Each structure stands twice: as C-alpha cells, then as structure tokens.
C-alpha cells in the first residue's frame, strides 16, 4: 500500500512542479501592458465611464493574479469631475483564462473610494452612463457582457447632491459588497456605513437586476437597521417615467422624536413622540407614498386606517385612522396655562415653529379619548394644518356626561399666536366641566355652555390679556358652594347685624343663567341670574381674566309664592379659586331699627370710621370706602340708640 502511494505521489508531485514552473514562467513572460490595457478596456466597457490612472500600476500573476491601479478616477465622457475616485482599484483575475493569455476580471475591490452622485433637476445624474451601459452589457447575448460579478468597497465615502430638491447627503466609512451572480438574474448588496453619526446596517436584493436597470418591474427587498430607526420593504420596484414601488413597509423606532431629528426633520414641540411602529401596504410613486391596511402605534396609541405622504417641495401628511382608545396626555404634558405653583397665567413664550414644517390633514375617531384629566367617550375629530394655521374640529365628543362639538384654530403671525375657539357643551356635568376648563370648583348641576372667543398673544398670559368674545351658560338643578343664600337671608332678616361665618354651605338652584361679554381680557356680565326654591340671586360687574379676580355686586332675595320678602345686596371680590363674599354693610345698617339713625347721623370722617370699625366686627366683612364727606359734623347718637345696638349684637 505504501509502495502504491509512493508510485502515485511521484506523478502528482511532478505535475504540481510543472504547474508551478508554468505559472512562474507565465508571470515573467506575460505582457503586462497588454494585461493592463485589457483590464482597463473591460472596466470601461462594463461601466461606460472613462478610466484615468494617475498613480502607479501593480501587476501580479503568481501567487496572486491581479492588477492594482493607484489614484484612479472614473467619469462620464462629458463630465468635468470624476464620478468616482479610488485610492487603490484592484482587479482580481481568473486563473485559467490567464494561463491561456486571456485576461478576465473575476471581481473588483475598491479601497477608500470617493463616490460622487450629482442628480440634476431633470432627474438625470452623472451616473446615468454607468446605469445605461451596465443594463446593456448584462442583457443576454450582449456583445460586451459583464465578465465580473462582484465589487467590494472598503472604507469608502459617498457624496450626494440633488439640484432639484436642493439637498445633499454624505455617507462615510462604507464597507459594502455588491454581487450579481452570472448564473442568476439577481443582484444583492450588503454592508455598513455611517450616516449622521450613526452606524447603519443595510442590505438590498433585486430578483431581476436587468429588468430593474431597464426600468421594468422587479422584485425588491431592502433592510436598514440603526439605533434610531429600523426600516424594511418587501415588494416590487419599477422606474419607467418615475420611481414606483409597491409592497409591505415596516418601520420601527424606540423614539420617533429622535428618529425625526436624525433624518433632518423638525419634531413637533412639546412631549410625546416616543415609541413608534408602522406596518402597511405601501404604494410609492415619485415623492408620494400611499399607505393602506395601516397598523400604526405611537406612544401606546394603536390605530388602523389609511395614510398618504408627499414631499413635493413641502411635506404633506393625510390620514384617516380609527382607534379603540387614544391618550393625548403626552403631547400636552409640557404645556402649562398657569405658572407652576401659582395663580398667575404662564408667561413662557409659545414655540410655534412646528406649525411651519408640515401640512397635515388628519381625521381620527376613537371609542375613548384621554386628554390630561379629561376623559371623553366616543369622539370624532379632525386636524388640519396648512401654511402655519392649525384648525381642530370636533364633530361630536362624549364628555362630562354630555356632548361637545366645535372648533379650535391657531394661526401664526411672527411670534404671535392668533387663537379662535367656538364650542358647544350640551347637557354636561357642570362640576367637572367648570373645574377642568376654567378652574372653578364651586358650581354643580347640568347645563349647556356656548363659548365663542378670540385672542392673540405670545404666551398664555398674552392670550388672557387680549381675550374677546362671548360665553353663555344655562343650567338647572344644581348648586353654588361657598355660601347658603337662603339661610343667610333668613338670619339677616331677623337680625340684620348678626355676625357669623357666611362663607359656608351651598346655594341650590332650579335655574342658572349666565351671559358674559369679553373685551381685552375683561369679562362683563350681561346677565347673571340664579333662581332657587326660596331665593333669587342676580349679579353685575366684571371679572379680570389676566389677574383671575372677581369684582362683582349682587342682590340676593328671599322669595315666597313668587313675591320678594327680603333683599340683601352683597359683594364678590378676590381670586377666582377663593373669592371673598360678604353682604353690603350699609344695607344691613339701614335695615336695623337700632342702627339706621347712626349712618345718617355720622357725618365727620373720624366718627364715621369709628362706627364702621364697630360694624365690621358685627358683619365679619369689610366696608367699601366711600367718597369723602365734607358736611358739618352731626350730634352724637343718643344713649338709647347705642344701647339698642349692643342688644342687637
């Protein structure tokens, strides 16, 4: 056996020696100029680009068969600048044809290539000759068919300029492998590159490369994965008059806000825009994308429907979506009407830049909607944003136990927001409605509220200071907390100067009517009437929206069988959330048989101030200062009158 192996090994060794000697001889005898020219001709024939070599050329046949060109440029015939610069372009050769003095490229390797893509306004680019040539040479039966089927790129850069859209991009540190097997019509590219500071893994495969290069329909699969964003497409592509793609599109990101910033888009101001996922059937024509069978998730909100996006000079997004539940709390979490921990309006300036970036036309419907503390039932609304003007319309929303409908608009004028709101609340719970919308916690019952307001300002305080419009409220079967009008009036009817705390209890009402007119941030009462089982209240005066304070006067009346038996003027002053309510002291004094003569008797200022001080202790409230009186002093009150006043107390 060993002897047989020896006999077999000798011929093999001789054969290998002959091959080695032949290769060595070939490497010395081969015409290197002819080899270089053949390689240059093949590259020119395949790419359609002129090859210019400024550096040295290395030729090796054994042990490696290759030709390396240093400082290479490739450009179209009419182009002034090369479309491709390469530090080292290496063409690896096929061994067997080389032994027969035929020079065929097996693959190309580019070290540190600098790729320049310039797209003109007419859609053509400096790479159009390459695409046309390679499409022609890859067709079956072509005269100059592609001899190599793989290109590798190492440490490359790509500069892209789009004259039509005035855009430019740059890819760096490109490591890429492109392959189109000769036994197949397919094309594949896999690799990595850096874009805007992030490493991107990408792959693309085309089922019919020749058809795709010719603009005909071909299968396409593409994947891009990076830290900010993941994207995948599986479908078909064609490019006759414009690029067309149809297939399944999936997008996923942990933060849509970060992904938008990474791609050069300005995210909306405020909060939200975190976790985002989309899967849809996509139809792409040019710069427009139509999405059907959409399943989209944003910040935990899941919806279905259709969407379209276009970027013909200005970004436009249209959508019709339906959801089971929507939560808009994240998007208003950074918006504050009131200053933190204070009763004053927030003076922080609005950020209106997001109104200018995108046009929006969206229709949403949901079974449940949450906006901060507000819970809505079935709701249908639309949002339209065009040329910096935002319009929100609510077709119908179940809220506060009733129905709401109306519109809200914001238009930008430099740094000023012009706001217009028109809303109707029908048969709503007033306690929840007044508390959440206006910060008023003293009203309960059910009613209808109509609001029509306009304002302009650069902050919530600016809006409050310029508020104009009207508001009307009609309510029934409720109560106003803070004081009990009926009990107070009955007590004061018996003892006008009796003291005690009047800021307790609540006043029930059968009907409540409020009509207000706003002008420059001041609300003036046109009609305020409260009708209860045994009392009636009317109010006149103003309320300042910027300072959030009341300045009202009213009359409370006891009623019996429709007739008025006792009336008490009173005053409402102070902040909205904690107003001071007290009866008019002068009216109480006049109603008391014991002290009525005092008010008429006291004429000089010192005596009047002394009496008023005593009366304040009786009433528990303050006496509003009157105009100075210069009349002659009156005689002091009689001892009997003073004794009667003490008994009343």
Model-identified regions with their sequence ranges:
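Extended terminal
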Residues: 2-13, 281-287, 294-297, 301, ...
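N-terminal type II signal-anchor transmembrane helix
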Residues: 1-48
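Short beta-strand segments that buttress and anchor functional surface loops
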Residues: 70-74, 189-194, 220-226, 292-296, ...
């Amino acid at each position: 056996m060993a002897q047989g192996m020896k006999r077999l090994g000798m011929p093999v060794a001789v054969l290998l020696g002959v091959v080695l000697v032949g290769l060595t001889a070939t490497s010395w005898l081969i015409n290197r100029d002819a080899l270089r020219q053949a390689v240059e001709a093949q590259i020119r024939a395949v790419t359609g680009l002129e090859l210019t070599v400024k550096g040295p050329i290395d030729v090796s046949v054994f042990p490696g068969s290759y030709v390396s060109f240093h400082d290479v440029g490739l450009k179209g015939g009419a182009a002034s600048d090369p479309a491709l610069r390469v530090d080292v372009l290496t063409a690896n050769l096929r061994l067997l044809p080389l032994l027969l003095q035929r020079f065929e490229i097996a693959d190309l390797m580019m070290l540190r290539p600098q790729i320049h893509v310039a797209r003109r306004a007419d859609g053509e680019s400096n790479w159009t000759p390459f695409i046309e040539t390679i499409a022609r040479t890859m067709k079956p039966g072509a005269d100059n068919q592609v001899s190599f089927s793989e290109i590798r790129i190492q440490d490359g850069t790509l500069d892209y300029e789009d004259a039509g859209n005035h855009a430019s991009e740059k890819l760096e540190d490109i490591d890429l492998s492109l392959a189109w097997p000769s036994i197949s019509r397919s094309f594949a590219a896999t690799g990595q590159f850096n874009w805007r500071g992030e490493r991107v893994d990408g792959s693309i495969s085309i089922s019919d490369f020749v058809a795709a290069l010719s603009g005909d329909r071909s299968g396409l699969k593409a994947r891009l994965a990076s830290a900010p964003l993941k994207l995948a497409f599986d479908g078909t592509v064609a490019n006759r008059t414009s690029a067309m793609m149809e297939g399944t599109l999936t997008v996923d990101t942990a933060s849509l806000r970060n992904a938008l910033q990474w791609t050069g888009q300005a995210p909306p101001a405020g909060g939200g825009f975190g976790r985002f996922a989309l899967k849809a059937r996509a139809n792409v024509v040019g710069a427009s994308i139509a999405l059907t069978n959409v399943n989209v998730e944003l910040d935990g909100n899941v919806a279905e429907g259709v969407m379209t996006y276009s970027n013909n000079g200005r970004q436009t997004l249209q959508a019709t979506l339906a959801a089971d539940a929507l939560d808009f709390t994240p998007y208003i979490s950074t918006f504050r009407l009131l200053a933190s921990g204070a009763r004053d309006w927030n003076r922080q300036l609005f950020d209106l830049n997001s109104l200018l970036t995108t046009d929006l036309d969206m229709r949403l419907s949901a079974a449940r909607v949450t906006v901060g503390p507000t819970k809505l039932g079935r709701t249908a609304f639309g949002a339209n944003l065009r040329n910096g003007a935002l319009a929100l319309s609510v077709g119908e929303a179940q809220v506060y136990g009733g129905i709401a409908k109306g519109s809200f608009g914001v238009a930008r004028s430099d740094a000023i927001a012009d706001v217009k709101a028109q809303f109707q609340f029908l048969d709503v719970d007033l306690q929840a409605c007044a508390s959440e919308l206006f910060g008023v916690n003293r009203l309960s019952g059910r009613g209808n509220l109509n609001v029509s307001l306009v304002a302009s300002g650069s902050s919530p305080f600016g809006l409050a200071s310029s508020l104009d419009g009207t508001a009307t409220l009609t309510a029934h079967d409720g109560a106003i907390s803070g004081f009990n009008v009926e009990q107070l009036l009955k007590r004061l009817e018996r003892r006008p100067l009796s003291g005690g705390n009047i800021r307790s209890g609540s006043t029930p009402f059968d009907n409540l009517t409020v009509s207000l007119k706003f002008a420059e941030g001041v609300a003036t009462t046109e009609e305020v009437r409260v009708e209860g089982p045994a009392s009636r209240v009317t109010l006149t005066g103003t309320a300042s929206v910027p300072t959030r304070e009341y300045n009202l006067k009213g009359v409370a009346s006891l009623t019996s069988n429709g007739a008025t038996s006792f009336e008490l003027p009173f005053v409402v002053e102070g902040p909205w959330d904690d107003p001071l309510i007290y009866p008019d002291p002068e009216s109480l004094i006049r109603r008391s048989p014991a002290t009525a003569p005092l008010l008429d008797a006291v004429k000089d200022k010192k005596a009047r101030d002394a009496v008023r001080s005593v009366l304040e202790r009786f009433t528990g409230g303050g006496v509003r200062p009157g105009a100075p009186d210069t009349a002659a002093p009156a005689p002091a009150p009689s001892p009997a009158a003073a004794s009667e006043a003490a008994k009343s107390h």
